[in-house]
């Protein structure tokens, strides 16, 4: 993000406050006719309902509840509800202590953090949560044998010796996290990170009870019976990754259990937005999944049941360069320029989402009060004529007249509608292209992406911490989250500089990140950004204290109260 030569953390605090003001909406900024923040307010004078049970619909299953293996927002959100790390985000997006007993102390160059832990934090089986639980989980995340999808990506180049351990050149105990005693952690960084405090709120960094994990063996986290919890709620029902319903109940061993009012949350999966809206109207659910259908949303415009906010998540087309045709830059440029993004957001989504000709979202990152987007360019703007020229040139270079691609999409109704529009746009504007859509459950979509078993794929990304780098370093050569076989040494060089040499030179670092964005989107057309998403939920007005987050988990449920 932004740092000053005198004090990285001081400026980070200022930057984060600006980021939060832009992202959280602050209650005054309405991005639509629905209610943007009203359900966050507690309604101090309202009486509580006799039964504090919340019913929630979600649009996807939970692929895993193992915090070092989670790589999706459903997993992150459920982990956030049932567990707690050193720090968490509060309802106003501020970093607050979780298991930590206060904020970190730093050495002079901000590369060593010392964190005291609360001595009353407990696991749901009664065991104390100690510094050793954090050391174990962090080491497990970076251990090559674990094959964590996020561990190496998140830690390498940031936590001391993470890169060396991931590459088999150092031992696990060399990782830059030490238990000085049962309740004192020391974290050593490769270099100062201006966003370190928001960074370690992420679910990957949650503790794990080594004795329990190892006792479960291969069964660990396979269902609710093989999990421990140290957060606001515990799972009392979840049959594993294919389960379409699960139950959370208040965790009485949680440190701040006295502040948790809900006694139970019932979750069910609904992949049909109309069915979700019907269930809400019938009073069968209190909160729906994110809704995108204009026909549904139009019925609730102006209603206090509609919660709408712009989130810093970008959706794009990924292009797998293991396919020889997609290795061709002109073919990729043609695809990137051929989709009518305005029609997509206005006519298909029609939910407040905006066109994205960029990677780092609007209203997310600021330097000296200026939005990253205001000083960066806009890339891959829709241009069907140019797209056709690139397409013809690419086909000629490949020596073919037709190309067929497999497009892997999700099996929700919203995804199917969007995917059908993408197919129509590409086939209509790029003669000779045949696109076959395969709609699959979320877990399978992730698996196919990870195995490179796709040609085109609709992907998206929400930030994991408060800095543009959370979007940019995804695309470095060999990046753990890339799964496209993309590589550009100049891009890698700029990202490395922004991560290392320029960390205390905010203006130069900003320029490097913006130059890297241009290479990725304009020069190489490695991905095709489509839109920045607006979130629309239906939520019972009697539900107070519902909090949504700008990065990491989507929501927090622990502050919810149900009124009469």
Segment roles from a protein language model:
Residues 355-394, 414-416:
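Structural transition elements
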Residues 130-137, 182-188, 262-264, 282, ...:
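Alpha-helical secondary-structure segments
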Residues 57-108, 228:
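N-terminal lobe/hinge region of extracytoplasmic solute-binding protein
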Residues 252-298:
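Ligand-site clamp/hinge motif
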Residues 102-150, 186, 325:
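Aromatic- and charge-enriched surface segment that lines or borders ligand/interaction sites
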Residues 116, 135, 149-211:
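Surface-exposed binding/hinge segments that line
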Residues 338-368, 413-423, 448-564:
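Detector for C-terminal structural segments
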Residues 183, 189-259, 264, 274:
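Gly/Pro-rich hinge or "lid" segments in bacterial periplasmic/extracellular proteins
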């Amino acid at each position: 993000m932004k740092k000053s030569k005198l004090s990285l953390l001081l400026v980070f605090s200022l930057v984060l406050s600006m980021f939060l003001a832009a992202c959280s909406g602050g209650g005054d900024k309405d991005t639509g006719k629905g209610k943007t923040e009203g359900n966050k307010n507690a309604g101090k004078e309202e009486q509580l309902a006799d039964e504090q049970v919340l019913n929630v619909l979600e649009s996807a299953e939970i692929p895993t509840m193992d915090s070092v293996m989670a790589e999706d927002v459903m997993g992150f959100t459920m982990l956030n509800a049932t567990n707690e790390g050193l720090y968490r985000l509060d309802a106003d997006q501020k970093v607050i202590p979780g298991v930590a007993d206060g904020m970190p102390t730093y050495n002079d160059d901000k590369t060593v953090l010392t964190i005291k832990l609360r001595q009353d934090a407990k696991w749901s089986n009664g065991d104390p949560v100690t510094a050793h639980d954090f050391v174990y989980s962090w080491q497990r995340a970076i251990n090559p044998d674990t094959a964590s999808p996020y561990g190496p990506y998140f830690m390498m180049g940031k936590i001391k010796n993470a890169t060396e351990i991931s590459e088999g050149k150092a031992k696990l105990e060399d990782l830059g996290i030490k238990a000085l005693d049962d309740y004192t952690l020391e974290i050593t960084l490769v270099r100062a990170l201006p966003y370190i405090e928001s960074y370690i709120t992420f679910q990957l960094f949650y503790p794990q009870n080594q004795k329990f994990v190892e006792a479960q063996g291969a069964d660990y986290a396979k269902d609710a019976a093989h999990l421990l919890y140290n957060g606001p709620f515990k799972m009392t029902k979840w049959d594993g990754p294919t389960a379409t319903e699960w139950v959370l109940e208040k965790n009485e061993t949680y440190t701040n259990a006295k502040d948790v009012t809900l006694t139970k949350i019932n979750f069910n999966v609904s992949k049909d937005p109309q069915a979700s809206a019907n269930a809400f109207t019938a009073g069968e659910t209190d909160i729906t999944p994110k809704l995108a259908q204009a026909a549904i949303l139009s019925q609730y415009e102006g209603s206090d049941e509609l919660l709408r906010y712009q989130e810093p998540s970008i959706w794009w087309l990924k292009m797998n360069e293991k396919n020889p045709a997609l290795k061709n830059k002109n073919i990729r440029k043609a695809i990137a320029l051929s989709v009518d993004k305005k029609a997509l957001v206005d006519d298909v989504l029609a939910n407040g989402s905006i066109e994205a000709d960029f990677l780092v979202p609007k209203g997310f990152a600021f330097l000296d009060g200026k939005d990253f987007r205001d000083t960066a360019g806009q890339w891959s703007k829709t241009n069907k004529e140019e797209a056709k020229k690139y397409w013809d040139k690419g086909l000629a270079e490949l020596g073919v007249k037709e190309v067929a691609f497999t497009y892997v999409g999700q099996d929700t109704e919203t995804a199917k509608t969007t995917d059908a529009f993408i197919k129509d746009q590409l086939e209509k504007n790029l003669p000779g292209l045949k696109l076959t859509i395969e709609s699959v459950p979320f877990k399978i979509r992730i698996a196919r992406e990870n195995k490179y078993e796709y040609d085109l794929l609709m992907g998206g990304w929400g930030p994991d911490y408060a800095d543009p780098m959370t979007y940019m370093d995804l695309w470095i050569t060999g990046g753990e989250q890339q799964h496209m076989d993309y590589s550009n040494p100049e891009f890698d060089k700029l990202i490395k500089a922004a991560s290392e040499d320029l960390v205390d030179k905010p203006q130069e670092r900003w320029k490097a990140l913006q130059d890297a964005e241009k290479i990725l989107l304009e020069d190489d057309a490695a991905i095709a950004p489509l839109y920045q998403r607006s979130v629309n939920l239906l939520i019972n007005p009697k539900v107070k204290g519902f909090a949504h987050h700008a990065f990491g988990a989507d929501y927090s449920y622990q502050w919810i109260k149900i009124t009469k």
